[in-house]
């Protein structure tokens, strides 16, 4: 089994993406396809009976485009492709996730931040358990306890995590392409450089901001224009309607 990083992860953006601007699903799928071919080329003696492909959430959307690409490239001839909870309309999905950070949460005020609220709950949770065990089942077990997060708190947590993801993508894409939106183009960055000022600036940019400032200009420059609605159709499952049917 081979597990690929998401095209939105900083390692994939920096090492495997041709344009270092994830968000145009067809381009992301082509990058993933090249990585898959490279992995196979590095293991020429590994016997393979059949190829299967699966993806979850954004990965499911990417998997659909990779499978469609393979219909013409015929490099893998996937026997089965499993799409788990793919976003039908990518723009609608990211817009909804962007809005979660605006959720009103009871208990948050000028003296108590959301992070303090969550940390206090985690502290009480571990005190009641009597030990600290960080594992894959932590969130499920925590949500079954008396300290569980409410729907509003969970929405805020998801929204906050999503905002950080957007910031990492925006920073990495801007830095590699020298666009100067977050990091000055000629600003020297070394191992000892503090990235805090750039993180603060990147956190002001949600996914809609990243789409507007980086994805759309890059896409228009490569396709001689096009409207936002055209891009939305091209990056969502709508583009594969005939293929999926």
Which residues does each PLM region occupy?
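Active-site signature of alpha/beta-hydrolase-fold catalytic machinery across serine-
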Residues: 65-69
